[in-house]
Amino acid sequence: MLLLLLLLLLLPPLVLRVAASRCLHDETQKSVSLLRPPFSQLPSKSRSSSLTLPSSRDPQPLRIQSCYLGDHISDGAWDPEGEGMRGGSRALAAVREATQRIQAVLAVQGPLLLSRDPAQYCHAVWGDPDSPNYHRCSLLNPGYKGESCLGAKIPDTHLRGYALWPEQGPPQLVQPDGPGVQNTDFLLYVRVAHTSKCHQETVSLCCPGWSTAAQSQLTAALTSWAQRRGFVMLPRLCLKLLGSSNLPTLASQSIRITGPSVIAYAACCQLDSEDRPLAGTIVYCAQHLTSPSLSHSDIVMATLHELLHALGFSGQLFKKWRDCPSGFSVRENCSTRQLVTRQDEWGQLLLTTPAVSLSLAKHLGVSGASLGVPLEEEEGLLSSHWEARLLQGSLMTATFDGAQRTRLDPITLAAFKDSGWYQVNHSAAEELLWGQGSGPEFGLVTTCGTGSSDFFCTGSGLGCHYLHLDKGSCSSDPMLEGCRMYKPLANGSECWKKENGFPAGVDNPHGEIYHPQSRCFFANLTSQLLPGDKPRHPSLTPHLKEAELMGRCYLHQCTGRGAYKVQVEGSPWVPCLPGKVIQIPGYYGLLFCPRGRLCQTNEDINAVTSPPVSLSTPDPLFQLSLELAGPPGHSLGKEQQEGLAEAVLEALASKGGTGRCYFHGPSITTSLVFTVHMWKSPGCQGPSVATLHKALTLTLQKKPLEVYHGGANFTTQPSKLLVTSDHNPSMTHLRLSMGLCLMLLILVGVMGTTAYQKRATLPVRPSASYHSPELHSTRVPVRGIREV
């Protein structure tokens, strides 16, 4: 037990939070009995009308009616007061927005009245085949309490009636037909509850050399630890023994823990006579609706995912899809599709319908049609999700990673066209960037680690998620089956969130900017060289390796489709050529411009900031030089010089009582002359650079700077204490103008005096030559810094 406690104490610093939610649709749908309109249990005069067939080639938008009943008939009764009421309103708002999006995409026609389940209300039926009421209800179930759909009680007003039949003759009506729900094609029941599925997640550990009992004990302890903190463990966690010690160490740099695990789940409950879904229920996990970590957009996208399951994107419903060769408006020609899914020679389950296969081929840039779209490997032969390796970012993959990174993609909409129940407005599709134009080999386990596609990565470094909205870590998960990609982190690494920026006064040597129009770029920019670093230039780095760069957040601005420019803190806008590396004025290092990732959609291009975003007005620029004196005969190598420069910089920042955001590009010569450029970075809190410059001058004149480095003491020389260069452009221009005016006045005066002397005296000797005073400009070039 001590071992477990030690492990749990070591665990928190290594946690890498990943904001992801998984879908439980397959196991949920299996628990629900699908009802179709049965042979009527009522006389013909009392029967409800069946679904009206479309009479037009222009079907109307799908009419979805949501019904929030607030019942408590299932496990996990939920208190609707206080936080619960707020969670319920969030759920209903998400349902309204999600159904509005669907209504603009899918279209059918017809009224709606739901069926009752004879197995629920009827205890026995007539079994004599010769009886006129054969298989009709002969004995009612005394415990019948009505119909429900995934725990939501269906009102009698939404249901057909039922009757008790004698062996011969007319029935005794028990419950007449309800009025039904007018102008509705699909009924969605909404529940908010605490259920067992909301907490359903398991941990499996791989601990080589450990007994099964020890692994089970550790699993239970880790699960308990995670759940007490509101997290749920992902299914796989590997530990290994370190030498002969009994204390396990982590096999990788992090343990992935997610929270929340399940936002919502849904199922279809009833079908019409052509197997089209008529009703379903979505259950929201109450504890997550009040979580600040989930935005309204997140809940809407999670709702949309579950709603599409209930409308037919389900392994349980694929076999019921219809083939309508004459088009949607002639339903009498429709039949059940003979082949919707199949397994290939490697056992991969594929959805093989025509529109889906063509849509995938178009997405990958393959001519003709693909052999089908891979479905996620799940328990059994049924799967209700796209394979994550191939369609990462699609709304219908098995894990949800936030609204910002999820798309209602063309391939998913093509699936609904193939269902035969709906017509699809393809203009509502959102572009899926993952794998676009990558060819038929993309997304295979055998190719994802070969470096053939930059959508995947190798190793475990930090970089950028493929949408470039977030920084990410190169990692895998069970859905990727060994393939690795830059997965977003949840520790304030979203570049588009301004609140993730650096606090006031904190040094920002890489010049990062967090802003709604910021994106993640692979870069190694720095405003100051650390000991051992060397400035890199494109000419010296013809093949820039991914390992040399990290994900950094910088401002971007679209200038056209696929064209953009970038801005680093304190720099001007710089054109970013896709597929190239660029340098940024004022910074050492390089920035890589991704190709085919940014400014690809009309939405991106329309988001151009006009006028360009201005973060702050640049402060004046100064150059500060100090001549140091060291021990007699003491010499420094190159690395020692760089170390001393860094030590002097730290001492200066300490002396000025400010952060390093005022000091840039420190250097030192072999003759021990230290030089640093002074300018105030945007976001840097404190006095103006001119005030700091003056204060440092006065302070160092009173008390020389002392630095201890490499076993030796260095001090500034009193006689050569400070040499400054003012780089304020306006002041420089003013001084130049005044100097020129003074020179002209002197020249005019000299010429006038000479002329007067010539006229007043005889030219007995040449006039004395006049040497005008030389004007020394105070402008000193600042390498790597643009003068403004």
Swiss-Prot record:
Binding residues for Zn(2+): H305, H309, H385
Subcellular location, principal:
membrane
Give the annotated active site: E306
Q: How does it sit in the membrane?
A: Single-pass type I membrane protein
Name its cellular compartments.
Membrane
Q: How far does the signal peptide extend, from start to end residue? A: 1-20
Going by the UniProt annotation, this protein carries glycans at N333, N425, N491, N524, N713
Q: Where is this region: Disordered?
A: 40-59, 767-788
> Under which EC number(s) is this enzyme classified?
3.4.24.-
One annotated GO biological process: cell adhesion
Renumbered to this chain, the Low complexity biased-composition regions fall at 40-56
Question: What residues form the membrane-spanning segments?
Answer: 736-756
Q: Which GO cellular component terms, listed alphabetically, does the Swiss-Prot or TrEMBL entry include?
A: cytoplasm; membrane
Taxonomic superkingdom: Eukaryota
Keywords of this entry: Disease variant, Glycoprotein, Heterotaxy, Hydrolase, Membrane, Metal-binding, Metalloprotease, Protease, Signal, Transmembrane, Transmembrane helix, Zinc
Q: What protein family is recorded?
A: Belongs to the peptidase M8 family.
Involvement in disease: Heterotaxy, visceral, 12, autosomal: A form of visceral heterotaxy, a complex disorder due to disruption of the normal left-right asymmetry of the thoracoabdominal organs. Visceral heterotaxy or situs ambiguus results in randomization of the placement of visceral organs, including the heart, lungs, liver, spleen, and stomach. The organs are oriented randomly with respect to the left-right axis and with respect to one another. It can be associated with a variety of congenital defects including cardiac malformations. Early death may occur. HTX12 inheritance is autosomal recessive.
The molecule here is called Ciliated left-right organizer metallopeptidase
This chain's source organism reads Homo sapiens (Human)
Ranked from the top, the taxonomy reads:
Eukaryota, Metazoa, Chordata, Craniata, Vertebrata
Q: Name the gene.
A: CIROP
